[in-house]
């Protein structure tokens, strides 16, 4: 076996490992975000988060109900961030996790593990 063949085998192994980690993290995200109905394959989630346009014209009672739902989503995300960090730490101790509501309609998750960075983005199915 020459050096080039060895390098190709190494590159393939590295790629396979990276893809395996990416899928493992994706599955962990799906598991943790199940309460807000995340679909990791379609990059969507289903939670009634509202924006200012939607909020206008709502009664105080309706507004409060929407606000409670949005807070519930934020609570799930905060809890998910901690749990995801613990799960990913099992793969490699050098990891970081950042879960955020990028806007009223998008959840963004960034995971860095073993010097590999993965970004996952989920769009709200309710958004226009």
Segments (PLM) and residue ranges:
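Acidic, low-complexity, intrinsically disordered interaction modules
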Residues: 39-119
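Short intrinsically disordered terminal tails
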Residues: 1-4, 8, 53-61, 117, ...
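Charge-rich, solvent-exposed alpha-helical interaction surfaces
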Residues: 5-12, 16, 24, 28, ...
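An N-terminal amphipathic alpha-helical segment
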Residues: 19-52
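Generic N-terminal leader/processing signal
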Residues: 16, 102, 121-122, 126
């Amino acid at each position: 076996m020459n050096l080039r063949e060895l390098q190709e085998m190494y590159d393939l192994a590295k790629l396979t490992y990276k893809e395996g980690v990416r899928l493992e993290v994706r599955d962990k995200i799906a598991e943790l975000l199940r309460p807000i109905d995340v679909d990791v394959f379609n990059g969507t989630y289903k939670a009634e988060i509202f924006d200012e346009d939607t909020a206008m014209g709502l009664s105080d009672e309706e507004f409060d109900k929407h606000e409670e739902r949005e807070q519930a989503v934020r609570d799930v995300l905060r809890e998910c961030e901690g749990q995801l960090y613990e799960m990913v730490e099992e793969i490699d101790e050098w990891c970081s996790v950042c879960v955020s509501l990028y806007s009223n309609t998008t959840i963004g998750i960034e995971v860095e593990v073993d010097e590999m960075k993965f970004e996952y983005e989920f769009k709200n199915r309710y958004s226009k």
